[in-house]
Regions:
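A beta-strand-loop signature enriched in Asp, Gly, Thr, and Trp
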Residues: 127-147, 163, 167
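Alpha-helical phosphate/pyrophosphate-handling elements in metalloenzyme active cores
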Residues: 35, 75-116, 152-157, 197-228
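Short, solvent-exposed positions on alpha-helices
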Residues: 43-47, 104-107, 187, 191, ...
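Mobile late-domain/C-terminal helix-loop "cap" segments
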Residues: 163-207
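Active-site flanking loop/helix segments enriched in acidic
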Residues: 10, 14-17, 63-83, 135-137, ...
């Protein structure tokens, strides 16, 4: 996080500099690999977990590769957030059934987590433009200033590519923000998030009936309505 305005949060990059922040992140990944090797009962499970982390990093690198790219498509965006956020949720959701050797449940849980993660990230990007800095606890427009064009920006570009591109190139970010707020970009972004939430809920409905299924469904629905 290069942005320095997160409220009430200590940040490694701000307190110790970018080099230590990067090395600290690398160290944490090594620690994760070590813990997985100690607790994974089968090599296949360890391989799947490492594959998820590989895809997670690939999503982050994909996003970096599209910095300041006004030709980025929604498909590019979905591919990147599927790695950087969707994969994290998918891995978290599928670890328990993976250990229990329930292949059918593992695959379903993975898909549920992926859809929830994608919806979560889209909503995060939606709130960057639909909320205020005070509500979010962090500066708005931080991503677009860093060349990260999320769903609201991409929908705005679809609506008026010439105008929005020109505003971005001239760093008139407040005007981009105003355009997004008055266009259909936010409505389309929310609809996109909802589509992934509904996909997750359809898969959740196929889980064994009971209190746990209802709880998972309730949490999934609430994520779509969050304001933070």
């Amino acid at each position: 996080e290069i942005g320095s305005g997160l409220v009430g949060s200590e940040m490694c990059i701000r307190d110790s500099g970018p080099e230590i922040a990067v090395y600290a992140g690398d160290y944490l990944f090594i620690a994760v690999f070590r813990l997985m090797s100690e607790h994974s009962l089968e090599l296949s499970n360890l391989t799947k977990n490492i594959g998820s982390i590989e895809r997670l990093l690939g999503g982050e690198l994909g996003q970096l590769n599209h910095h300041f790219n006004l030709q980025q498509t929604l498909d590019d965006y979905i591919e990147n957030i599927s790695g950087k956020t969707g994969e994290l949720f998918a891995l978290s959701a599928s670890v328990a059934p993976l250990i229990s050797k329930n292949n059918t449940l593992t695959k379903r849980a993975y898909k549920i987590g992926m859809n929830i993660g994608i919806s979560f990230q889209i909503m995060d990007d939606y709130l960057d433009y639909a909320s205020t800095a005070q509500t979010l606890g962090k500066p708005v427009l931080e991503d677009i200033k860093q060349g990260i064009y999320s769903a609201p920006v991409l929908f705005a570009l679809q609506e008026n590519n010439a105008l929005v591109s020109e505003l971005i190139k001239n760093e008139k970010f407040d005007e981009v923000y105003d355009f997004i707020k008055t266009s259909d970009a936010l409505e389309k972004t929310k609809a996109l998030a909802k589509s992934y939430t509904l996909s997750a809920l359809n898969l959740i409905d196929k889980l064994p009936k009971g209190k746990n299924r209802e709880l998972i469904a309730e949490i999934t629905r609430k994520l779509l309505e969050r304001t933070l």
